[in-house]
Amino acid sequence: MIGGLLSDLVVALPLLALLAVLADAIAAPRGCGVMGARTVYGLAVLLLAALLGFGVLLFLTGAPMVSAAGVAILAASLSLISNIKRKVLGEPLVFSDFALIGAVFRHPQFYLSAMRPWQVAVLAGGLGGLALTLVLLSNAWLAPRLAGVAFSFGAWAGLTLSLARIRRTGFAIVPDPEADVARLGLVPCLLAQWHIWRASVDPLPCDAEPIAGLSGQLVVIVQCE
């Protein structure tokens, strides 16, 4: 069993890295390096994030190849969703967009109207196929699950150090999602935004005196996304 697991990992881990890089390359805007490459820090965070996802799925399924494919499908789906948002609203995904996940299910027609039929089919088919594959190809072996735990903890430790290093470079002091994604990549950019948000201090509450409005006063609020 151990020998079979090692042989599977020898194939699955390089495949995981390749698919993660290809999935990130789909996300617009492209990188500024040679052939659209991201920075070294962005690549490191991407591979560590892929390894973390791989470890979690390996713990859940016990199947290395399925776990690698699952991470690739999720990363490619994020890139596709980000490209659609960028086409409609002019910017790629940002960390705060995940607060709107509930709105996607409450008002799906708003988001589906921005997608072409083939994009809906690819996204639904990919996520549905991933769920079905995870159910059908999972096994009860203990060794892969222990390996998944080890990969997850190792990747989490590496991500913590890498994201702290990115924060110290002054990342996102002035928000610029286009430039940030071009430099780091989509998933590294989302994780860096989350890390900076976690480290930020909440502002003090406003202590200004309330302004008394006129009776029957009309207030118009316009929200733009």
Enumerate the language-model features and the residues they cover.
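Transmembrane and membrane-interface helices of multi-pass
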Residues: 1-176
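Soluble catalytic regions of membrane-associated enzymes that act on cell-envelope
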Residues: 168-224
